[in-house]
Amino acid sequence: MGVTGNSDLYTDYLNNIGAAMKDASGNEIKDNIKGSQCWCPITNLDTADAAYEWNMGQYASTGTRASGTFTKTLSDDLTAKYVEYVNNIKLKNPSGNELTLTSTNAGTYYDYLKSVLEESLNNFLSDTTFPYTPSSSCGGAPSGSGAPSGSGSPPSIRHLETYDTADDYISSLNSDETWITKDSSTGNYTISSVEAFVKHCKTASKDVGAFDDLSKTQAENKLFGISYSTNTKHFDSIMANLLSDKSSTYSSLTNLDSSYSTEYTNDLSVTDHLGKTITERVNMYNPMYYLNSYYDGYESSDVADYFRINTGITQGDTSNVVEMNLFLALSNYGKNV
């Protein structure tokens, strides 16, 4: 709602449900708002599956990401597609420098994510009163229908012990390897890599196709369902294209259902009762569509002035970069975040 104010994409739907569109004087009623509180936003569904694999999936090797499975190769391909996407959207950091990726694990975009994770760690340590007893393990636990098959539980880094000092707490996180270090001159902590953070604190809790599940079992599949047809639909055009373009490669690997490609293609061709395509509806739901010049909808809505984005940085239901991209896009758009 904070980004889609007065968007024409919603007009047909509002008229269809009989929403008030004009006041008593015949003036158009506006629906833009002043500010938005965003808690763990599940957005950017056009690239959410690719973002999940780039941020988390590429560092996993069990379940649907096990070697020899077609879904492992699909994960790698989605990761590569996300690199392309990042370089297309040309986000800038707060200093005005463009963020790019030179590979799946390198580039200024990667470095910026790493710095965000480090900032969160240092803020947590400075804001927390020690002795400290965590309420849960760092990695959390898979939950819901999206829990990955065969992946097991993520590593329990904190054991619900009480830590007397910040250094004691960091020592527990470094119990199996040293991936967090302290700068003796500044007192700040840094992490060795995004991969280390993911493996210790943010393991993937969903299978490949984290949002547009191959079996159409995720809540997002229901979101794009067509009431008069079936209740769930595929919506990820990146996955649809990969399943079609790389069918010969995937067919040589395990766990491929030959119907996947056809199902994605068929679902993406369906329109709803107002003649809107799945892609149009994905755009409606995507803040980046309105905020970034890569998309046709750039500057087509009245965006709120103020935003606050809150999220659990270690939760495995979505990638860190969805929220990070939203922050950067809003900042690049001139909004207060």
Residue positions per predicted region:
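Primarily recognizes the serine-hydrolase "nucleophile elbow" in alpha/beta-hydrolase
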Residues: 1-59, 138, 146
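Short, surface-exposed, polar/charged, turn-prone segments marking secondary-structure boundaries
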Residues: 16-17, 63-68, 335-336
